[in-house]
Amino acid sequence: MASQGTKRSYEQMETDGERQNATEIRASVGKMIDGIGRFYIQMCTELKLSDYEGRLIQNSLTIERMVLSAFDERRNRYLEEHPSAGKDPKKTGGPIYKRVDGKWMRELILYDKEEIRRIWRQANNGDDATRGLTHMMIWHSNLNDTTYQRTRALVRTGMDPRMCSLMQGSTLPRRSGAAGAAVKGVGTMVMELIRMIKRGINDRNFWRGENGRKTRSAYERMCNILKGKFQTAAQRAMMDQVRESRNPGNAEIEDLIFSARSALILRGSVAHKSCLPACVYGPAVASGYDFEKEGYSLVGIDPFKLLQNSQVYSLIRPNENPAHKSQLVWMACHSAAFEDLRLLSFIRGTKVSPRGKLSTRGVQIASNENMDTMESSTLELRSRYWAIRTRSGGNTNQQRASAGQISVQPTFSVQRNLPFDKSTVMAAFTGNTEGRTSDMRAEIIRMMEDAKPEEVSFRGRGVFELSDEKATNPIVPSFDMSNEGSYFFGDNAEEYDN
């Protein structure tokens, strides 16, 4: 059951799951992009945005959030049943930034959700186009992964902040479907499961009755998704144990944390896709590009080519560095928050620095921030090379990593060794080898101890020139091994607050 995800490409998960050939998949993904682009153009018209304002990433985020909110049925139901003061459950909105008399002004807009849904459906040939919505959710998730470190969330569930490389997709909404599940990291799945088990421990009725049956099947489904991410038999067997537990409790939480730690060395397979902001798709569609006809893939050269020819702007706070803001967004566009920085620097063609060294805060501007001192600048989102996104964790080996992040989760299928700090990881595995899962634990620890520093992952895979669309001449990069490979190194990134 768990392996079915590995047999379908994500483009198929992104579509309706039936097997399609490459051309059909490319057309189908292209159609989704067309829909987002058409919707964005229409929204810019509604809001009377100039071309420059329409290419402002903050405006894009507001418009994306509005349509996601308009289609969030569960939350909409909840808002109608629990009316809160000053919040109209039928409306959605946010800040739109306009250039007035040489200054940036913030304007709070409010729309009927019904109206937004109508515009979205119209842009998508009458469909709800859930795939396009999920695509935008993944873009927001990738941006969060690049901007914030989930230290608090990790500590709250009893995990270690150094495991942040396992947390891809930790802010994705639950309704993000199969495409969303594919991009979630091992740590994210473990955290969701631990939260569930803790609720069960604290609330006697959580697993009982009609609702309890639904809860139970959600629990088993999540266990299976996590199992499908693991690449070794022992890790998978451990997930079977957790899934089959009659009454999940602390033993299961222990097993889950153990399996998450083991994933720092025995990495799980996590999908990566380049999801771009709507303000990239809009202008491309407006210029007459037909994504459905031309075909599009989230895991090949297409997003790189699109970014080479796109102009995106961002608001910049007084003490922020525009180049650093560009790096943040570039990494988010390629789902590369947990990739090795040496490789990212090579692909991008400019040095990619750890989060703590960047003079930039998040992309979104809070409502209480002063607009008088806001400037805007062009985001540099181009790259020197392109590479194929991976959904495997790569095989394992070792190199000294840092205090902040002690492993990577590869984004690109490119030959290199994968840094992780073996001594730090292994130090966490003292003690507990008794209990039902003892043989699996012993086996997992043995495999981790056998992981060799000199082993190369993705052997023979390289990056490609942007002119090499068919990926015929791989260029295998060589790295300076003395350089720091982790993005959240000894980090001081802000916390993500929901």
From Swiss-Prot:
A Pfam family reported for this protein in Swiss-Prot or TrEMBL: Flu_NP
Sequence motif Bipartite nuclear localization signal, residues: 198-216
Signal peptide limits: none
Any one Gene Ontology BP term: symbiont entry into host cell
Residue stretches in coiled coil: none
Motif stretch (Unconventional nuclear localization signal): 1-18
Chief location category: virion
Places the protein is found: Virion; Host nucleus
InterPro entries membership: Flu_NP (IPR002141)
One MF annotation (Gene Ontology) recorded for this entry: structural molecule activity
GO CC aspect terms: helical viral capsid; host cell; host cell nucleus; ribonucleoprotein complex; viral nucleocapsid
PTM text: Late in virus-infected cells, may be cleaved from a 56-kDa protein to a 53-kDa protein by a cellular caspase. This cleavage might be a marker for the onset of apoptosis in infected cells or have a specific function in virus host interaction.
Region (Disordered): 1-21
Binding partners and assembly: Homomultimerizes to form the nucleocapsid. May bind host exportin-1/XPO1. Binds to viral genomic RNA. Protein-RNA contacts are mediated by a combination of electrostatic interactions between positively charged residues and the phosphate backbone and planar interactions between aromatic side chains and bases.
Role, per record: Encapsidates the negative strand viral RNA, protecting it from nucleases. The encapsidated genomic RNA is termed the ribonucleoprotein (RNP) and serves as template for transcription and replication. The RNP needs to be localized in the host nucleus to start an infectious cycle, but is too large to diffuse through the nuclear pore complex. NP comprises at least 2 nuclear localization signals that are responsible for the active RNP import into the nucleus through cellular importin alpha/beta pathway.
Name the UniProt record assigns to this protein: Nucleoprotein
Organism of this sequence: Influenza A virus (strain A/California/10/1978 H1N1)
